C-alpha cells in the first residue's frame, strides 16, 4: 500500500469513528439502555376482567414507554398456572402477576378474609374494605416473601353451577365441588354437605364434562369464558362470595427500576385498576346474558328464605378462621362481632 493510500485509509477510519461517535451522542439515553421486560402470566381467558386488565396495562405501557419497557401477557395459563406463578415471581423469573386472593393463604392467613362466605353483601362493600387503611396495608404484607402487592382487581361475586338444581343446602349433599386452593372454601363446601375438590382452573371444564366433579363456584364471566355452562345444566345465583385478584410485582425488580420508568408504570397500573374495576360488573352482566341466551343452562333464583338457609349453613365457617385473619381485618370488612 502506498503512503497516499495509507493516509486515505486512516482518514476514512477516523471519519467513520467520528460519525459513529456523533450518532451515539445523538441517541437518547433510553435507546442505549436495556428495555425493561415485564412478563405477566395469568390463568384466565382474555375476555375476562383479569384478561382485559392485563391487555389494557400492556397497551398503556407500549404507548407511554416505547422502547423503554414492554409487557408480555401470557393468558389462560399458557406460561404457568397461578400457584407456579407465585414461586416464579418470588424468584424473579417473572415480574408481575394478578393472582386470586384465595391462593395466598399458604403465605398468610390474613387474605382468607376475602373467602369468608356471605361476608361481603356486594361489590360496594368489597371496594370499601379494599380502599380502607387496613385493606391498603394488606397489599404490602407479602413483600418479605418476594411478592409486593400494588392493587386489587375485581372479577365479581360467585354463584354455584351443578349437574342438578341447587335450591337449598341439602341439595348439595354428596356432590363433588371444584374449589380453588383455599381451606376456607374447603370448609364452606363441607358446611353444606358437599365434597370439595381442590383443582387448577385449567382442569375444571374437562372434569365437569367427564363427571369427575359435579359442581363448582364462579363468577358469570368465568362461567361464560370457560364455557362451564355447556357442561353444567344449572346455575344458582347466590352471590355467596367474592373473586378478586392481587396485582403484585417482584419487589427487587420494582425497586430496581429508574424512578421515571417506575412512575410511569405506577400511573399506568392505577389507570388500569380503575378501568378493570369499572368494567367488571358490565363484563359479568354481559356474560350472564350470553349464558342464559344459549339455552344450555337453567337459572335458579333463590327466594329470600332459601338464600338465608345457605347463609346460615356457611356462617359457622367464619369462626373457624377468624383467629388467623385477625379482628382488625374482620371489623374493617364489616363482619359482625
Predicted regions, residues:
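Sec/Tat signal peptide C-region and signal peptidase I cleavage site
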Residues: 27-33
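N-terminal secretory/targeting leader peptides
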Residues: 18, 22, 34-125, 133-337
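Bacterial N-terminal signal peptides that target proteins for export
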Residues: 2-19
